């Protein structure tokens, strides 16, 4: 079997019976289906070149570069000695042995919006512009959505996505785990531009839109970069390196404060498989390499300790130039850093990270036994620490959120060895003191959603909970057997996988569902500019839905 893959070293490859690994034949990473000839495979690459590759794996690969370097995402056709293919630059190319035509010179400006966003909520204040909706990570809004719902558009996605839809400037932006970044019109779903960087590896990170800039952490085992793009064209403006692994659950992009982009991560050595049970996700750890500690790129949600070279780091860069303005290293307090969160509220930056719950195991390994984590307030302009607490902190797999002078922290792990319970914490943002600790929960994953009316958190394959705002008591719960779903909240509705719409004000009534376009349950939908947007995580589709009166007056395309 022959196929293309959007991964460096696997542009065009062959799978053979009895062989566990595919054999790379040639060409650049691609999302286009290959066409097989007698002796060659023909396909277009994400670099804008057409490739003709010998099926034998021997011999020279031939390539043709298109005019503007835009990706080729559709299959080519071969007939009567000619190759026909379309490119995302808008041109149809025909190649043949006697071809003498010049390459096109005119850029067709396909990245320009042709169908501006419509509706009463088309203004920027209604954008869902980050994975958690805003830089406070409330993961919530209220845009008066209501049934009925109708599909406005649906389109194919060639890649794996694990972040919620991000919107701004009339566009929806997507980052695939394999390194693509692309934008489509919010109004129609038409592709505007697509960019690709190799060596991105299982990077489930989200973009953030900010004043016609798009910032995206693109992580890989060989190198990781924060990239700043022109949101209207996808053109790279600047890029800077960072360290650490976002792993499964840190979708968070940088937060933006005035002219600064601020990001938190860890450090250390990584491979596909780590060399300690606490550093891997599954399988057998690698053999120890002396004192060297290696963490799996995708590691476990059970985190008793972290490698000794994992440092909690924060960077701040000038959002216009990428120049580093300040950097902080908190490894003098503890070791960890990947399982962290950042949020902005009322002009202050809040940071929390986890160092592992097992003080006894850390002590035996020669690591600082305490603390197990930290939370702090920081002056975002300078990086100066305003207050620190090591009593209360995230416990991995969850960011922190802020609203109305309060911080909300969750996580996968127990906070320490004295308990197997997990809790949500509410802190006073003025000094980090504890306002309340919730009733026990199985876990609190991704983010605590904090709306004007509701505070919601869900556990992986467990209950979803609503909490009393003043006490943290669980006031109601439900369980539809969701997995690690990244819900969002558009009050009074909770938006889940496959466009489930759950009314939190009416005993968790499921008021709408579908179309069921995803075989997984990792992602919920979001509401931006009065519309619902949804990325399927594993089934390769994106969809936009209209709501209420707008849906009532809309005729779906297949009935026109």
Which residue stretches match the model-derived regions?
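Sequence/structural signature of beta-propeller modules
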Residues: 98-146, 549-560
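Kelch-like beta-propeller repeat domains
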Residues: 101-102, 301, 321-324, 370-372, ...
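Cationic, amphipathic, low-complexity alpha-helical segments enriched
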Residues: 1-5, 12-14, 21
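A short helix->beta-strand "capping" segment at the edge of beta-propeller domains
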Residues: 18, 140-159
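Short loop/turn segments that connect beta-strands within beta-propeller blades
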Residues: 14-18, 54-58, 97-99, 185-188, ...
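A structural motif specific to WD40 beta-propellers
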Residues: 20-21, 61-63, 103, 152, ...
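Glycine-centered loop/turn positions within well-structured domains
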Residues: 48, 59, 90, 179, ...
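Repeat-blade elements of multi-bladed beta-propeller folds
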Residues: 1-8, 26-51, 55, 68-93, ...
